[in-house]
A protein has these predicted regions:
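Conserved donor NDP-sugar-binding/catalytic core segment of glycosyltransferases
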Residues: 77-120, 124
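A conserved acidic beta->alpha catalytic loop
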Residues: 10, 25-34, 50
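A short, conserved alpha-helix in the catalytic core of glycosyltransferases
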Residues: 145-196
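Short, acidic, metal-binding catalytic loop of nucleotide-sugar glycosyltransferases
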Residues: 9-18
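Glycine-rich, basic loop-to-helix element that forms the pyrophosphate-binding segment
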Residues: 48-65, 75, 86
């Protein structure tokens, strides 16, 4: 509960612009929603009877909001002075887009927690520059692949145009999917370094077989929904190699059943994928050629996972496979 209280206190202390706070409690086991709804009667608390998943919870918060803009926040962070004003200044300059702040480690603010979400051409997402020292090198506004869900500023009318988060994701990659989909509709994502947050970063999850199940399943949801069939066809040989390597990797960690489970889940979701593909591909304004320009030909594995779950060899393998898949050619011809 301390995370949520610190987060709320930082918003109240460091926000000058008119705002409302909406807290969505996904049936948390500590009943923090009940506690804080009594302590902060001026804050709107939505108490779900069950855990509906991260994206559905976010959607509920968005639907309860009354303003022109929404900021989606994890509860395990604090915002710094003028954080919201800096978002609004960026909006005045760049217009309708998705925005994210510079994120620093809560317990060591000299270390970056992320300077933008990056997407690998095979659908892997990661936080750029996570774990490196902040030496003033990343203090310029930049376009990124997607705005991380830790803290995301969005003009509400974007949701009216592209739809809300895909609730089928349940956990992980939902913001990657939103950022990709937004870009297809013509809305970019920006990293705004003057807007600062300090993120604890491990309050919600640990690396586990269940995490990898959702990451792998949702990676395929993203690919099948958002790429054109032509691009999927071009990437298909490399995607097969990725799958074979992932099967070997999961087997080596004795969690192969989770990878197999992800395939069955995708099969069950084919109707949903088909429905979403039809909407996205009919309404998209940006070609794969253009959107891939903001992707990267490599992947960086989070430091938290390097020692026990994924090693440098797999990271290098993915980068090599990007070259073998003729990434530059796909960019030119997609």
């Amino acid at each position: 509960m301390n995370f949520l209280e610190d987060c709320i206190s930082s918003i109240i202390s460091n926000t000058k612009t008119n705002y409302e706070i909406i807290v969505v409690d996904n049936n948390s086991p500590d009943k923090s929603g009940d506690f804080f709804s009594k302590k902060y009667p001026h804050i709107k608390f939505v108490l779900n009877k069950k855990n509906v998943g991260v994206p559905a919870g976010l959607n509920i918060g968005i639907q309860h909001s009354l303003g022109k803009f929404v900021v989606l926040l994890n509860n395990d962070l604090i915002v710094m002075p003028n954080w919201l004003d800096n978002f609004l200044d960026a909006y005045k300059k760049f217009g309708d887009a998705l925005y994210m702040p510079k994120s620093l480690k809560f317990n060591n603010p000299e270390i970056l927690d992320g300077t933008g979400g990056m997407i690998n051409i095979f659908g892997f997402g990661f936080a750029r520059n996570k774990g490196i020292r902040d030496v003033g090198k990343y203090d310029e506004i930049e376009e990124v692949s997607y705005a991380a869900g830790t803290c995301m500023f969005v003009p509400k009318k974007i949701f009216d145009k592209i739809g809300l988060f895909d609730a089928k994701f349940f956990a992980y990659h939902e913001e990657l999917d939103l950022g990709w989909r937004a870009r297809l509709y013509g809305f970019k994502s920006y990293y705004i370094p003057k807007s600062l947050i300090h993120h604890y970063g491990s309050a919600h999850w640990q690396w586990s077989s269940q995490v990898f199940y959702f990451l792998e399943r949702n990676r395929w949801l993203v690919l099948l929904k958002n790429y054109s069939l032509i691009t999927i066809f071009k990437l298909f040989p490399s995607l097969i190699l990725i799958e074979l390597s992932m099967l070997v990797f999961f087997a080596s960690k004795k969690i192969l059943f989770k990878k197999i489970k992800s395939y069955f889940s995708i099969i069950r979701l084919l109707g949903h994928i088909k429905q979403q593909r039809k909407i996205i591909q009919q309404q998209r304004k940006i070609s794969d050629n253009e959107i891939i320009q903001s992707f990267c030909g490599t992947i960086k594995i989070p430091l938290e996972a390097n020692d026990s779950i994924i090693n440098d060899k797999f990271e290098k393998f993915l980068s090599s496979l990007c070259k073998l898949s003729k990434y530059d050619k796909i960019v030119r011809e997609a």
